[in-house]
Amino acid sequence: MEAFSAYVTMNARFHALLNELSASSPLIREIDRVSALPFASPSAFVMAQSALPEAHQILLIGQDHHRIVVDAIENREGARAEAVMREHSRLAARNLRLAIRNRTHLDLLPALALLKSSAE
């Protein structure tokens, strides 16, 4: 659980730095707006997923997205960076579905108890 806590801290820092380094007021406002939505923050499900067998794979996918977006930015490939971040944001929806399906660690995300999977 300690490793997941460290990941949450580092992940939040990465996203904050990426946001800050963009130096784009409209982009910063939009990311701040979206991040404030329920279940949409960068690490919204990390702790709730910590006991799942898929947790490691999910984190590796997210980290790979981070590496790819940094590479795209370094190479001035704006469209690629945008596409990668759009895909990265879709992980939140995937993670929400996984959290609803598994219902583990509801104590960490009490609002999940209000949601039902499409199978219910």
Q: Over which residues does each language-model region extend?
A:
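Short secondary-structure boundary micro-motifs
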Residues: E2-F4, E54-Q57
